[in-house]
Amino acid sequence: MQAKAVARTVRIAPRKARLVIDLIRGKKVGEAFAILRHTPKAASPIIEKVLKSAVANAEHNYDMDINNLVVSQAYVNEGPTLKRFRPRARGQASAINKRTSHITIVVSEKKEG
């Protein structure tokens, strides 16, 4: 059985979020929380919140045991990009892309044995 949580249109670049999400993929949930708490990246608290939601979904919706949960899938997709302009010299302007992310975490119960 699998439980899933998704955070859509989060204001962090997918490239930066992937650095953190790669650290927790395949880990036990308790270990993943410990890694996220000690990772000094802006994406860490956001991903921790999504992981907490996935664990709550597993416990509440599917009656899974929290102690046996493993992060089976964790990925970041690109969300819509906010396009902004930065004024430059001599009346010019440069485009600034403020990227957003869709963060998905799937947890499943580890098989005993």
Curated annotation (Swiss-Prot):
InterPro entries: Ribosomal_uL22, Ribosomal_uL22_bac/chlpt-type, Ribosomal_uL22_bac/org-type, Ribosomal_uL22_CS, Ribosomal_uL22_sf. It holds the Pfam family Ribosomal_L22. The keyword Magnesium does not apply. Keywords: Ribonucleoprotein, Ribosomal protein, RNA-binding, rRNA-binding. One of its GO terms (biological process) is translation. The keyword Membrane does not apply. One of its GO terms (molecular function) is structural constituent of ribosome. CDD domains: Ribosomal_L22. One of its GO terms (cellular component) is cytosolic large ribosomal subunit. Belongs to the universal ribosomal protein uL22 family. This protein binds specifically to 23S rRNA; its binding is stimulated by other ribosomal proteins, e.g. L4, L17, and L20. It is important during the early stages of 50S assembly. It makes multiple contacts with different domains of the 23S rRNA in the assembled 50S subunit and ribosome. Part of the 50S ribosomal subunit. This is Large ribosomal subunit protein uL22. It comes from Geobacillus thermodenitrificans (strain NG80-2).
